[in-house]
Amino acid sequence: MGKEKTHINLVVIGHVDAGKSTTTGHLIYKLGGIDARTIAKFEADAKEMGKSSFKYAWVLDKLKAERERGITIDIALWKFSTAKFEYTVIDAPGHRDFIKNMITGTSQADVALLVIDGNNFEAGIAEGGSTKEHALLAYTLGVKQLAVGINKMDDVKDKDGGPWAQGRYNEVVDYLGPELMKIGFKKKDKGDKKKGDKKEKKDKKDKGEKKYVCSATFVPISGWTGDNMLEKSTNMPWYTGPTLFEVLDAMKPPKRPTEDPLRLPLQDVYKIGGIGTVPVGRVETGILKAGMQVTFEPAGKAAVEVKSVEMHHTSVPQAIPGDNVGFNVKLTVKDIKRGDVCGDTKNDPPIPTECFLANVIIQDHKNIRNGYTPVLDCHTAHIACKFASILSKKDKRGKQTHDVSDDTEWATKDDAEPRNNRMNIAAKTGESVNVWLQPTKAMVVEAYSMYSPLGRFAVRDMKKTVAVGVIQCVQPRNMAKGATEELPIRGESDAVSKYIKFRPLPLKAGKKAKK
């Protein structure tokens, strides 16, 4: 028996109509993930509906509504293998109306493929476009390795009117590279002088010298014809870099926190005939095994036995971080739902959150103040959370401009009651704040230092991402009936002792999640 390949989850993101599903479907087909007969059937069905170019996209677009509209609404899972890895593909929607599903898919990914329409690149970066927002969300949700497929190269035009144009490819790369670096997709430029080099400080005036380069790998492709997907394209001899397949095979295997307690955010819950209730999701930390006792929060279900664990319709003895699995439990489909978190009942089980302290960077908003209540997307949860108490603010240059602890009148008080935040700090695009956030419905989040996949989030409002954040510490909710005692704060942060007195007043003790 050969060594089992490492599992990697790949999310395919990008603006609507960039060709994500076609590119992914063609790649899966080329790698033997689907047979020619099925592709021929898809082609016949597509022609009948007047959409003959959709045959590869339909490998993933399984819902009838998606086929008729020609856009991906749900997230679809498929798999293929490279020399080193076993890939699970998550094809995420590009349409703005379905960004919630895109976030759910991206929260489960290790690496991302950003598909760009080389022929109509401007639509994805214009106001209302999804290209940069998808890249930002991917990075915020923990995806640090990115491949960029400049798609539809068979259809682009250069100045002379021919397809496969190098000029257009360069134009897209020159614009997108710096934008991705601003988001965080960057690495040290190997061409820079190393620390300690005698020539390092030779020219102090040249402060514009690049010290970082974009860490994303760009590949010109055609999802329709298959150029540069597995084999080098004869249509683009000017491109000497790796194929898309080679880029995916060169990804670094993600670190898997198997030693940590179990955390598995639920993506969906199904009722399967002859089996029963099957929650599905990605193991973020720890190990899930058949026979273990698990807890679901904020559903309030504890000591539930895991009957069996399946991955890609095959029974497995256990699932480790990164695995997308379904597992059978003796509950009804109404007992648990998407956004609930599964953990080991006997080892630090998840606890619903009363409020949490976070550092939030404002991406696109003119005036955020106390009381603002947008939707937060954290792991698979999609819950409105109130900016209960903005505590401090830094400007675009990182200089601190406001801090509630500077209120000298409060500084002299030592009462134990939560204190009112009287500063009413306002924040706008480019600024960052420390803030106590309070969910309007029961949810589970964790401090980034303890469970990083459950400790980062995106803030969405008006159909766009307005901010991203990292959770510093969490005040768990005491779910015991009639409880008055506060549970210990989870997570460590220098800001905790400074700002703990400004926590929002707790919700009613023992309050269950709203269904």
UniProtKB/Swiss-Prot annotation:
Residues 5-258 form the tr-type G domain. GO terms for molecular function: GTP binding; GTPase activity; translation elongation factor activity. PROSITE patterns: G_TR_1, G_TR_2. InterPro entries: EFTu-like_2 (IPR004161), G_TR_CS (IPR031157), GTP-eEF1A_C (IPR054696), P-loop_NTPase (IPR027417), T_Tr_GTP-bd_dom (IPR000795), TRAFAC_GTPase_members (IPR050100), Transl_B-barrel_sf (IPR009000), Transl_elong_EF1A/Init_IF2_C (IPR009001). The modification N6,N6-dimethyllysine is found at residue 55. The keyword Phosphoprotein does not apply. Residues 70-74 are annotated as: G2. Keywords: Cytoplasm, Elongation factor, GTP-binding, Methylation, Nucleotide-binding, Protein biosynthesis. It holds the Pfam family GTP-eEF1A_C. Gene3D superfamilies: P-loop containing nucleotide triphosphate hydrolases, Translation factors. The modification N6,N6,N6-trimethyllysine is found at residues 79, 334, 441. The modification N6-methyllysine is found at residue 289. Residues 222-224 are annotated as: G5. Residues 187-206, 396-419 are annotated as: Disordered. Residues 189-206, 398-419 have a biased composition (Basic and acidic residues). Its main location: cytoplasm. Residues 151-154 are annotated as: G4. One of its GO terms (cellular component) is cytoplasm. This protein promotes the GTP-dependent binding of aminoacyl-tRNA to the A-site of ribosomes during protein biosynthesis. Belongs to the TRAFAC class translation factor GTPase superfamily. Classic translation factor GTPase family. EF-Tu/EF-1A subfamily. This is Elongation factor 1-alpha S. It comes from Porphyra purpurea.
